[in-house]
Structure formats: C-alpha cells, structure tokens
Amino acid sequence: DCPSDWSPYGQYCYKFFQQKMNWADAERFCSEQAKGGHLVSFQSDGETDFVVNLVTEKIQSSDLYAWIGLRVQNKEKQCSSKWSDGSSVSYENVVGRTVKKCFALEKEQEFFVWINIYCGQQNPFVCKSPPP
C-alpha cells in the first residue's frame, strides 16, 4: 500500500510536488522521500496518462513544466537517454534532441508532451517509488 498522500498505479506510488527545484535536486529529493524513489519514469501509455492526470489536477496554472526522470547522458562519444531510476527508455514520447539535457512534461493546452529543457530550471516534479 502507498502512503496516504501518494497515489497508486500498477506496482508503484506517485506524488506531485509543488515546490520548485532543478532536475538534480528534484531527483535527490525523490530519493529521500522513499526507499527506491526517483523522478517519475514511464513504461507505458497508461502510466503516462495516470501521471499526466495527477499533474493536471495539482499543478498551478502559471507552471508550464514538471520534471520527469529522463536525462540525456553523455558517455564518451555516445549519447544515451536513461531514466533516473536506471531503467532504459523502451517507451518514448519525444521529439527532437538539443543541448538541453533534462526532460519535463510541458503543458500544451490540456495535453502534456515531453520536452527537453535546461537542467538548472526550477520546476515542480513527480516522484515515483515502490510501496514501502
């Protein structure tokens, strides 16, 4: 069972945090909230829809982005994208690549797309963890 202020979906618990942090601080914060916690990763359309609904309910109208756990990592000359929880990107909803290395959900009317933006930006975020 998830803690009372977290929302269950599948085998994980999710929580939207309103406070704004950069990507690295948000990832660290998630890992401190729960054992095995990370910024949210998505493994299916259903999981993405669930999180988008959670964010849509809670996010302030002035906020345009919410961090997710996807970051482009440079390994020697190869560029790979991995979720912050270590899972590989088997499921993508991404358009284009630039020097902006960290991904967030972007509010486009009611639909959230994944967009890569500068990692130092301060944004709210979603944590995902296994149940305690």
Curated annotation (Swiss-Prot):
Its main location: secreted. Residues 9-128 form the C-type lectin domain. Pfam families: Lectin_C (PF00059). Gene3D superfamilies: Mannose-Binding Protein A, subunit A. One of its GO terms (molecular function) is toxin activity. PROSITE patterns: C_TYPE_LECTIN_1, C_TYPE_LECTIN_2. GO terms for cellular component: extracellular region. Disulfide bonds join C2-C13, C30-C127, C102-C119. Keywords: Blood coagulation cascade inhibiting toxin, Disulfide bond, Hemostasis impairing toxin, Platelet aggregation inhibiting toxin, Secreted, Toxin. It is found in: Secreted. Expressed by the venom gland. InterPro entries: C-type_lectin-like, C-type_lectin-like/link_sf, C-type_lectin/snaclec_domain, C-type_lectin_CS, CTDL_fold. Belongs to the snaclec family. Thrombin and prothrombin (F2) inhibitor. The IC(50) of thrombin-induced platelet aggregation and fibrinocoagulation is 62 and 35 nM, respectively. Its inhibitory activity is at least 10-fold lower than that observed for other thrombin inhibitors. Heterodimer of subunits alpha and beta; disulfide-linked. This is Snaclec bothroinsularin subunit alpha.
